[in-house]
């Protein structure tokens, strides 16, 4: 397994997996652009683990640390910063939208899947949808 770690203000760690595929009955959904809608404030410290998988590519796992008391706008900024730190800026663009939303778009290359693998942050709800 090959690992690459990136830390941004002590909040973000990214891990690139050298292998891994989805099960046949658990096929990911691909798009060129995704929206992550953040609702509610954090009621605990914790982490959010996202997986970005280019079609027929290597999955990239992005772990974002969230501090207790962070509001939805700041959580969106933490997620945006996590994507920026972990993903190649020549391939992906990320930004916040409406304060509490994060957009992740491809600049070039194949469409990609985006999923929240797990979250240990209490109270925060995320809605991930294709744009």
Feature annotation, model-predicted:
Residues 1-10:
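Bacterial N-terminal signal peptides that target proteins for export
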Residues 4, 19-29:
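Short, flexible, surface-exposed loop segments at domain boundaries
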Residues 9-18:
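Bacterial N-terminal signal peptides
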Residues 25-131:
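Polar, low-complexity export/assembly segments characteristic of proteins
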